Regions:
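C-terminal catalytic/acceptor-binding lobe
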Residues: 151-152, 156-206
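Short, acidic, metal-binding catalytic loop of nucleotide-sugar glycosyltransferases
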Residues: 19-32
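Short beta-strand-to-loop acidic/aromatic patch adjacent to the donor-nucleotide binding site
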Residues: 94-105
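A conserved acidic beta->alpha catalytic loop
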Residues: 13, 38-50, 69-70, 104
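Conserved catalytic core of nucleotide-sugar-dependent glycosyltransferases
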Residues: 104-168
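Active-site beta-to-alpha loop of glycosyltransferases that engages the nucleotide-sugar donor
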Residues: 7-22, 41, 73
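Active-site-proximal specificity loops/subdomain of glycosyltransferases
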Residues: 46-94
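Hydrophobic targeting segments
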Residues: 2-7, 24, 34-38
Length: 206
């Protein structure tokens, strides 16, 4: 399975990105995958700093910057970054997207454990491994922080919401991850939630 690791980045998470890139370097040594980072910081300057981190950890990712309006909310900015990743998966001939957020440190065998679950059955379209919410101990976090998504889903569903086009579509971008999952399930696909397979997962906040 040809996998693209893709994640939005922003300068506000500079506190964790070098540790994350070191983690990526070790993981991709064990399970080869390409890396795409989509920056939505204010201006393109932050990319230079990220490239220095990549050089230090012998990574050669593709990094693009989206120049988005300052008034655009955080959730929409992230959604537009994910749409850029979706387009890269489709144009690059990848079989799956590994959505792995930069504030999560995972074991180097994590991806190799998720891939067989996605390949096991044709009806499994998404495999998401729960982690813990930083603010509330022992509360599961159901976002796309560590999630493997099959290409088939990305061919069908965009991350750009066309409000009013579907009566079940949310009115804001905040629950857009839940909406993506809902579309997959509504169309007969299977969304698999996994707990305990990948351990430990560190959700960084500083």
């Amino acid at each position: 399975m040809r996998v693209l690791i893709g994640t939005p980045i922003h300068e506000v998470k500079d506190y964790c990105i070098e540790r994350w890139l070191k983690n990526v370097s070790k993981l991709t040594h064990k399970t080869p995958a390409d890396l795409l980072m989509v920056d939505n910081s204010t201006g393109p300057a932050y990319i230079k700093k990220v490239r220095q981190y990549c050089k230090k950890h012998t990574l050669h990712p593709k990094i693009i910057h989206l120049e988005l309006p300052h008034t655009q909310g955080r959730y929409e900015r992230v959604a537009r970054c994910r749409e850029a990743i979706r387009q890269e998966v489709l144009s690059g001939g990848y079989d799956a997207w590994f959505s792995w957020e930069t504030d999560q440190i995972i074991p180097t065998d994590a991806l190799s454990k998720l891939i067989p679950l996605l390949e096991a059955k044709n009806f499994v379209k998404i495999v998401s491994h729960n982690n813990w919410t930083r603010q509330i101990p022992n509360l599961p976090n159901y976002d796309f922080g560590c999630t493997l998504i099959k290409r088939e889903c990305l061919e069908k569903y965009s991350f750009i919401l066309k409000f009013g086009s579907d009566p079940q579509m949310p009115a804001t971008y905040e629950p857009s991850e839940a909406w993506f999952r809902k579309q997959v399930i509504r169309d007969g696909g299977c969304y698999l939630e996994v707990q305990g397979l990948i351990n430990p997962i560190y959700h960084l906040n500083k």
